Amino acid sequence: MQTRPRFAVQSLFAILATAAALVAGCSSSSETSDAPLPDGAALLQESASKTKTQQSVHLLLTVQGKVDGLPVEKLDGDLTNAPAVAAEGTADLIAFGQKIADAKFVIADGNLYAALTPGDPLSNYGAAANIYDVSAILNPDTGLANVLANFSDATADGRESINGTEAVRVKGNVSADAVNKIAPALKADGPVPGTAWITEDDHTLLQAQLEPTPGNSVTMTLSDWGKQVNVTKPAA
């Protein structure tokens, strides 16, 4: 196996790791109602409890600015932990000084398959967990639910429409431990500013965002929670 393609695949999954890390920019959002806001800390805990029970999601991740260890512009894909860990999607990333657009990836039967050049067949890069354990994203102890449960100084500071659904915007700081469990590539050594967009009525997490350094952030838009994800294992 060639080193350069494998490095690019590792970069892609460092991205997916941080995707687990969180949310905002390229979805449609706008300020909405000026109704009284709920308690931000309570809303985060309610959303954390709901997110713990989820086993599948569609995610759209974008990076604003430059985040060290994360050479990605966008990742768009589906992920499930049941009945087995599986994922598929595409990513735009920078590797070897060049942009790789719409790189396809599939995780099936524990292995990572990827095609870094459009039109190429998917190649088997071996055990996906050796690059990034995607099950961590939906794991209640290491993933999105754990991030929501580890906000400090949480404050609900407004409402926004996220892709047509009204959400309460909650800002605060996420513990370094929670950040590093879901996104080791960020190598946080202190609390990281974070924002979560959560529906008030059923506590669904619609977006999340981490800002490791001022002006540089990772944003993930989440949808289709609980929808069945069917991933076909590529032919050998």
Swiss-Prot record:
CDD domains assigned: LppX-like
Single biological process term from Gene Ontology: response to antibiotic
InterPro entries, sorted: LolA/LolB/LppX, LppX/LprAFG
Subcellular location: Cell inner membrane; Secreted, Cell wall
Keywords linked to the UniProt accession: Antibiotic resistance, Cell inner membrane, Cell membrane, Cell wall, Lipid transport, Lipid-binding, Lipoprotein, Membrane, Palmitate, Secreted, Signal, Transport
GO MF annotation, one: lipid binding
UniProt-listed Pfam families: LppX_LprAFG
Lipidation (S-diacylglycerol cysteine): C26
PROSITE patterns found in the cross-reference section: PROKAR_LIPOPROTEIN
Inducing stimuli: Part of the lrpG-MSMEG_3069/MSMEI_2992 operon.
Main location: membrane
Record bears the keyword Membrane: yes
Membrane topology: Lipid-anchor
Mutant phenotype after disruption: A single lprG deletion shows reduced incorporation of trehalose monomycolate analog O-AlkTMM and increased incorporation of analog N-AlkTMM. Double deletions of the lprG-MSMEG_3069/MSMEI_2992 operon are more sensitive to ethidium bromide; restoration of wild-type growth is conferred by the M.tuberculosis operon. Cells display abnormal colony morphology and are defective for sliding motility under carbon-limiting conditions.
Entry keyword annotation includes Chloroplast: no
Record lipid sites (N-palmitoyl cysteine): C26
Ranges in a coiled coil: none
Leader sequence residues: 1-25
One CC-aspect GO term: extracellular region
Function as written in the Swiss-Prot or TrEMBL entry: Helps membrane protein MSMEG_3069/MSMEI_2992 (P55) transport triacylglycerides (TAG) across the inner cell membrane into the periplasm and probably ultimately to the outer membrane. Binds TAG in its hydrophobic cavity and transfers it between lipid bilayers. TAG probably regulates lipid metabolism and growth regulation and plays a structural role in the outer membrane. Also binds mannosides, lipoarabinomannan and lipomannan and various glycolipids in the same cavity. Required for MSMEG_3069/MSMEI_2992 export activity.
Complexes and interactors: Interacts with itself, Ag85A (MSMEG_6398), LppI (MSMEG_3851) and LppK (MSMEG_3904) in vivo.
Family affiliation: Belongs to the LppX/LprAFG lipoprotein family.
Domain comment in the entry: Forms a U-shaped beta-half-barrel with a small hydrophobic cavity able to hold a triacylated lipid or triacylglyceride. A flexible lid region may move to accommodate different TAG molecules.
Record-given protein name: Lipoarabinomannan carrier protein LprG
Upper classification of the organism: Bacteria, Bacillati, Actinomycetota, Actinomycetes, Mycobacteriales
